[in-house]
């Protein structure tokens, strides 16, 4: 007798072992048709999985997140099947599920073209309509290696050869195609109805630039056509908002091959940067942080002591001078510990909060670079809090409150918080980790926020809180972090004199709110589609004259606004006013002031707000007051 407990708490009993598909069929024909897989005691399995002992079972359908993952994984295999069917010489490698879709890497003797993608997608649709059953078999490692070598799939054979000889290998087949996979997969290809191939990109075998270059075909797959259409529409919107395009259109920044991963900021872009930096400086100053500045280049010995040289060396830029090795800092924390160590610290000095807009450099691979979002040179709104164990909960509460307030000011109201917990390989005792994790939970609870816990995702030196902001398109970006560190203070000899005159290690909290300034500006540009709120806009106002006779008045008006702290310019060119308005509208300037003879004589201005909104004619002082209210409204 096999007893199976379902999610609603009911128990079904069977006289003999049954498959997930048979359980679904016994519940009802609708569920049998909808079943894509199952969850046996929390483990995702195929519908063909045999149940021979008492378990808890959930039937997975397209309504479940796991169901969508199964569909995407199976669609990746369908892609490989179609490619092999159309281009038998192509070799298959790997094809995982990613956010919103999947990809598959191929080795082929010529580049795939857009026409090839159309042909492949059409073939996928034909194969899906055949509704071929998907079967699984388990073989030994050596048998699997021999099979893939016999059909000329050297990459698959190489993957399997790296697996321990005692491990069983799962092979999935449908039609004339067999692939290595952990599964699970849909019961038949007919379940794959909504998908689209997106693009081809380059990739390296096993992600190593020293290996052969492959071709990566990206695709997306969904359970409903309307979901896919919504996703494709979001991509169109994202394309319009691409910070690289807007950076060029709005003359904010550029990047060039002579300095890969580094940003050339133009005047308006640097003005935007300064607004963000100055805002952040005000906030951390008000929160009791002390701003410091640490060297960009430091001796190898310091990086060895911190552990970065051993664990992060390949991502560090290094140099040599007078027979000494140096590294350009990839992060600011070791330098902050040096400031803390400079002098004897007492428990009365704590907490000490050091902030730095620290310039860091990391040797990211050129293929990973992406506009402002992934760079080699960046500035962090970095800070480190040195405190006692009794203080770290209150410091965590204060940081969370500050971070959430900052995100709101920048226009991000949807923030997801994640708590990364202890990994298997870690420093410190279980008791220490218990206190650290529970302390962060207490801090988040005190702030009245909800969070998701991620077991095993913490760093080896401590648990971490992550802040993921959602932009106008619903995309999630991790920006802020609060990382408890139980290792670096010991490695670098940080200590303070406790109340009982003993020497103790401080708790060290690494924290950032916006993270990389470059990346955050990229997110801001895309979130606001380049139309920054008035307080952030690099150019808040443009004053335009209709004819030469109003040029002097327009110029004096711009100068008056500038003296009052407004970021303004006067456009006195001998162009039609409609041309000027259109040009500055495309520049997404919040306010356009137009002056003609009537405005000059009455000492007024005609005001147009962004979006073509006519606010009418008003005295300059009235406009200034309106602008001030607009600027202050973000608070």
Curated annotation (Swiss-Prot):
UniProt keywords, alphabetically: Aminoacyl-tRNA synthetase, ATP-binding, Cytoplasm, Ligase, Metal-binding, Nucleotide-binding, Protein biosynthesis, RNA-binding, tRNA-binding, Zinc
Q: Where in the cell is it found?
A: Cytoplasm
The record's comment on cofactor binding reads: Binds 1 zinc ion per subunit.
User: Could you name the domain of life of the organism this protein comes from?
Assistant: Bacteria
What positions does the entry give for Zn(2+) binding? Answer: 333, 384, 510
**Quick one: where's region Catalytic?**
242-533
Q: Catalysed reaction per UniProt?
A: tRNA(Thr) + L-threonine + ATP = L-threonyl-tRNA(Thr) + AMP + diphosphate + H(+)
- Which cofactors go with this protein? Zn(2+)
Recorded hits in InterPro entries, A to Z, give: aa-tRNA-synt_IIb (IPR002314), aa-tRNA-synth_II (IPR006195), aa-tRNA-synth_II/BPL/LPL (IPR045864), Anticodon-bd (IPR004154), Anticodon-bd_dom_sf (IPR036621), Beta-grasp_dom_sf (IPR012675), TGS (IPR004095), TGS-like (IPR012676)
What are the annotated GO cellular component locations?
Answer: cytosol
Q: Where does the TGS domain lie?
A: 1-61
Coiled-coil intervals, chain numbering? none
Q: What is its main location?
A: cytoplasm
EC number of this enzyme: 6.1.1.3
Q: Which GO terms describe its biological process?
A: threonyl-tRNA aminoacylation
- Name the Gene Ontology molecular function terms of this record: ATP binding; metal ion binding; threonine-tRNA ligase activity; tRNA binding
Q: Give the enzyme class.
A: ligase
Q: What does this protein do?
A: Catalyzes the attachment of threonine to tRNA(Thr) in a two-step reaction: L-threonine is first activated by ATP to form Thr-AMP and then transferred to the acceptor end of tRNA(Thr). Also edits incorrectly charged L-seryl-tRNA(Thr).
Quaternary structure, per UniProt, is: Homodimer.
Q: Which family does it belong to?
A: Belongs to the class-II aminoacyl-tRNA synthetase family.
What is this protein identified as? Threonine--tRNA ligase
Organism source for this protein? Paraburkholderia phytofirmans (strain DSM 17436 / LMG 22146 / PsJN) (Burkholderia phytofirmans)
């Amino acid at each position: 007798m096999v007893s199976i407990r379902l999610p609603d708490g009911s128990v079904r009993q069977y006289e003999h072992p049954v498959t997930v598909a048979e359980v679904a069929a016994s519940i009802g024909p609708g569920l049998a048709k909808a079943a894509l897989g199952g969850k046996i005691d929390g483990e995702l399995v195929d519908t063909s999985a045999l149940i021979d002992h008492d378990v808890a079972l959930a039937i997975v359908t397209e309504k479940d997140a796991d169901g969508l993952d199964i569909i995407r994984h199976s669609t990746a295999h369908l892609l490989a099947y179609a490619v092999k069917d159309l281009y038998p010489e192509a070799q298959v490698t790997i094809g995982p599920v990613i956010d919103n879709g999947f990809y598959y890497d191929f080795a082929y003797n010529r580049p795939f073209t857009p026409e090839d993608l159309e042909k492949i997608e059409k073939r996928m649709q034909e194969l899906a309509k055949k509704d071929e059953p998907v079967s699984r078999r388990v073989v030994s490692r050596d048998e699997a290696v021999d099979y893939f070598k016999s059909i000329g799939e050297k990459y698959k054979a190489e993957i399997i050869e790296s697996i321990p000889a005692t491990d069983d290998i799962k092979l999935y087949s449908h039609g004339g195609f067999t692939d290595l996979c952990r599964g699970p997969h849909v019961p038949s290809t007919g379940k794959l109805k909504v998908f689209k191939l997106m693009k081809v990109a380059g990739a390296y075998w096993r992600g190593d630039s020293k290996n052969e270059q492959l071709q990566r075909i990206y695709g997306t797959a969904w359970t409903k056509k309307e979901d896919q259409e919504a996703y494709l529409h979001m991509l169109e919107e994202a394309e319009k908002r691409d910070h690289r395009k807007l950076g060029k259109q709005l003359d904010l920044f550029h990047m060039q091959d002579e300095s890969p991963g580094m940003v050339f900021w133009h005047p308006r872009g640097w003005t935007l940067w300064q607004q963000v930096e100055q805002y952040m400086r005000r906030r951390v100053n008000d929160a009791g942080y002390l701003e410091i500045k640490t060297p960009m280049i430091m001796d190898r010995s310091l990086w060895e002591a911190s552990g970065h040289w051993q664990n992060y060396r390949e991502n560090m830029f290094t140099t040599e001078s007078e027979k000494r090795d140096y590294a350009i800092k990839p992060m600011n924390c070791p330098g902050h510990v040096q400031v803390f160590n400079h002098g004897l610290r007492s428990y009365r000095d704590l907490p000490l909060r050091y902030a730095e807009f620290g310039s860091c450099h990391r040797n990211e691979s050129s293929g990973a670079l992406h506009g402002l979002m992934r760079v080699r040179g960046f500035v962090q709104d970095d800070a480190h809090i040195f405190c006692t164990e009794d203080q770290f909960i209150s410091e965590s509460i204060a940081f969370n409150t500050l971070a959430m307030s900052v995100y709101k000011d920048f226009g991000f109201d949807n923030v997801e918080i994640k708590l990364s917990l202890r990994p298997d390989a870690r420093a410190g005792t279980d008791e220490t980790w218990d206190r650290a994790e529970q302390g962060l939970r207490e801090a988040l609870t005190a702030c009245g926020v909800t969070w998701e816990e991620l077991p095993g995702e913490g760093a080896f030196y401590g648990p971490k809180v992550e802040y993921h902001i959602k932009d106008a398109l619903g995309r999630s970006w991790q920006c802020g972090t609060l990382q408890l560190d139980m290792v670096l203070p010991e490695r670098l000899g940080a200590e303070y004199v406790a109340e009982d005159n003993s020497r103790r290690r401080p708790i060290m909290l690494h924290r950032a709110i916006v993270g990389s300034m470059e990346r955050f500006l990229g997110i801001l540009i895309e979130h606001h589609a380049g139309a920054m709120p008035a307080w952030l806009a690099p150019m808040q106002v443009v004053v335009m004259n209709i004819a030469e006779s109003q040029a002097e008045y327009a110029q004096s008006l711009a100068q008056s606004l500038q003296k009052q702290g407004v970021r303004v310019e006067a456009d006195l060119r001998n162009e039609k006013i409609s041309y000027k308005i259109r040009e500055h509208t495309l520049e997404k300037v919040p306010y356009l002031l137009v002056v003609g003879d009537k405005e000059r004589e009455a000492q007024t201005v005609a005001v147009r707000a962004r979006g073509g909104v006519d606010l009418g004619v008003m005295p300059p002082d009235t406009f200034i007051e309106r602008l001030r209210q607009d600027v202050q409204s973000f608070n």
